[in-house]
């Protein structure tokens, strides 16, 4: 089976998406037919596999390529010999953050009837906004930490709105990859932390920070009626897993497996199933959990995890191919114009 990897995007996580695509090239050797790059101006470019390395993008060489036009079932490439349709194999949406995870690309791909692996429109909207994610989890009976939602209008009253003691953690509501996230240990650190978070989002979440909390990551997808899970990862971290720890450490290809009981692993999987069904059908996602006093809490849902979390699976290729065979199908609406014909007939 062949794939097309779509990456880039107008997002704070643009470069992370490039790194993910390069990593996926290695994980799916020989299976990726096309690499389609989406730049910050929403132009699509076809990137040769030989150019899928950091130096190429650091030098912005893709700007010399002819842009492509998205159309039904593929991409349109103009040349001196006329327009040519590039028919796309199954697309993997690997655009992190804005464009890829907020629903824009899901809408575009669905509109043009281009099959893809990734979160659909509703799943994107709910998981991209951390506040909505908490409401969604609560409705499903999945626990989440207490929180306060701040915006520019009420930020001046932040200390009065926060109902828990220092330290607490501040994070943008609409950003991933630990961008804009900071731990506030005392009042004098608050303004700087708020300024940093508001650079990435119009709304921010504030949660109690619990020192030494156990954190577990679990990736997976649903293939037909059965779930396929990765192994459980316990990230090596200091206070929290920051941007550098997530993306600038290339010293290992595999994440550390968690040492946990069978009972706890089963709890994580049951919570994952609640969050996945049926909203995320067709996507491979990662759920990040906290365990506090033997209770499982959702930290966040990552609808397009970095490098598609391939490093957490023992057989990633087979998992992805099986998922590709069980994507949800949207029924095509047949337009018969029977109502209009009846009106015309009665005239």
UniProtKB/Swiss-Prot annotation:
Catalytic activity: 2 D-alanine + ATP = D-alanyl-D-alanine + ADP + phosphate + H(+)
Domain of life of the organism encoding this protein: Bacteria
Keyword field: ATP-binding, Cell shape, Cell wall biogenesis/degradation, Cytoplasm, Ligase, Magnesium, Manganese, Metal-binding, Nucleotide-binding, Peptidoglycan synthesis
Any GO molecular function: D-alanine-D-alanine ligase activity
InterPro entries on file: ATP-grasp, ATP_grasp_subdomain_1, D-Ala_lig_Van_CS, D_ala_D_ala, Dala_Dala_lig_C, Dala_Dala_lig_N, PreATP-grasp_dom_sf
Pathway assigned in UniProt: Cell wall biogenesis; peptidoglycan biosynthesis
Listed GO biological process terms: cell wall organization; peptidoglycan biosynthetic process; regulation of cell shape
PANTHER family, sorted: D-ALANINE--D-ALANINE LIGASE, D-ALANINE--D-ALANINE LIGASE B
Name listed for the protein in its UniProt record: D-alanine--D-alanine ligase
Organism: Helicobacter pylori (strain Shi470)
């Amino acid at each position: 089976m062949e794939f097309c990897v779509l990456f880039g995007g107008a997002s704070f996580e643009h470069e992370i998406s490039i790194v993910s695509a390069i990593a996926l090239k290695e994980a799916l050797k020989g299976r990726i037919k096309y690499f389609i790059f989406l730049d910050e101006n929403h132009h699509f470019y076809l990137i040769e596999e030989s150019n899928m390395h950091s130096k190429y993008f650091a030098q912005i060489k893709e700007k010399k390529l002819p842009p492509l036009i998205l159309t039904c079932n593929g991409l349109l490439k103009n040349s001196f010999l006329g327009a040519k349709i590039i028919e796309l194999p199954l697309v993997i949406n690997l655009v992190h953050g804005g464009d890829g995870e907020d629903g824009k690309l899901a809408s575009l791909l669905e509109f043009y009837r281009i099959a893809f692996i990734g979160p659909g429109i509703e799943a994107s909207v709910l998981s991209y906004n951390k506040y909505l994610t908490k409401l969604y989890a609560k409705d499903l009976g999945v626990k989440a930490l207490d929180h306060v939602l701040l915006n520019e209008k009420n930020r001046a009253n932040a200390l009065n709105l926060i109902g828990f003691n220092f330290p607490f953690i501040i994070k943008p509501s609409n950003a991933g990859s630990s961008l804009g996230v900071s731990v506030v240990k005392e009042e004098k650190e608050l303004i700087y932390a708020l300024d940093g978070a508001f650079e990435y989002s119009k709304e921010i979440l504030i949660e109690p920070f619990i020192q030494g909390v156990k954190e577990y990551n679990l990736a997976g997808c649903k293939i037909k009626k059965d779930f396929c899970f990765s192994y459980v990862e316990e990230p090596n971290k200091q206070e929290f897993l920051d941007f550098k720890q997530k993306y600038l450490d290339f010293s290992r290809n595999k994440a550390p497996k968690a040492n946990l009981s069978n009972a706890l692993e089963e709890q994580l999987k049951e919570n994952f199933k609640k969050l996945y069904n049926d909203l995320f059908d067709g996507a491979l996602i990662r759920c990040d959990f906290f365990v506090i006093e033997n209770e499982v809490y959702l930290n966040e849902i990552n609808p397009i995890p970095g490098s598609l979390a391939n490093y957490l699976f023992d057989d990633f290729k087979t998992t992805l191919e099986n998922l590709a065979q069980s994507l949800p199908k949207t029924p095509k609406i047949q337009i018969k114009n029977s109502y209009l014909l009846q009106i015309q007939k009665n005239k």
